[in-house]
Amino acid sequence: MVEEIGRTAEGDIIINVGPQHPATHGVLHLVITINGETIKKVEPHLGYIHRSIEKMCESLSYRQFIYVTSRMDYLSSHINNHACALCVERGLQVEIPARAQVIRVLMDELTRIASHELWWGAMAMDLGAFTPFFHAFRERESINDIMEETCGARLTMNYIVPGGVMQDIHPNFQTRVKNFITLYKSKVSEYEELVTGNIIFQNRMKGVGYLSADDAVSYGCTGPTARGSGVSCDIRKLYPYEIYAQLEFDEILETGSDSFARYIVRIKEMNQSIRIIEQLIDAIPAGDFQAKTKAVLKLPKGEFYQRVETARGEFGVYIVSEGGTTPYRIKFRSPGFSNLSALDHMARGSKLGDLVAMMGTLDLVIPDIDR
């Protein structure tokens, strides 16, 4: 998993980390130059699970390609599907029923919490704390049960279709969501007790992986990675889609610019997602859950772009249409690729043992980066 592969003329050691390593949470290969325990350079090598997803999508219909994106950032699969559907709907100029919009946003925020829960448990486990992982999965399983009851799947939901959602919510949906909110609020104090307020955890995180606001912008970082450096970049606030402009919630910003600041952003974001869900769960309007669209969709000739806020940052979908039933060109803008590009800058001068903490706060999902 970690091996020496050479030395530089200055005597620095070059080592491999991965591509099979538990800290990468996927197939990620890092070539690291170290002087003693001090990192001098981190060079990510990608391509181990490249699947030509963008090219694959160009041979699929506008209904089919949406679900391929579930296999990219699989922890934000619903939000990825949402972005694709919005981009297609922009081209079709379809008006989405109010009921479908509310359901979509509710599912987005549940997905965001589920993703952050997994990150929180894995982040703590990477630093040697095993107990929080089981606490995180307790809450996450409640969300997965809601997802399964609503659309039949627990991870890659494929619930969104152009024009709305695949089917209406389960009769128990609102009750199950309210029960989850009650559970989460009763357990969130444990997060502070187990991890956030733990002095050992703080010592491992504070001052580690510094990334200034200017550097975050230069590297194209988005999501909690950038907001931990004080950069305002929440797409739900800056470029509202669906009904986000009508909702009351805060964009979480921290100015610490280190691993602990990025950690705090994600913890507080879960509370904001709960706040959004509470505003909507008793306000789901009656009506259709899907607009009437043709079975075979044709986008007019042109270029269309849509961005959304996933659990990891800005996810963008760019479609070039020649007026046919399949895209002429599709390009995805994934948050993980830009966030990973900042790892070398963050790590230089740090100790090798701190690399795990830095990578953990980037919340990398490798299929999102290497697609």
Regions found by a protein language model. Name each.
Residues 1-29, 33-329, 333-371:
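Active-site bordering "gate/hinge" segments
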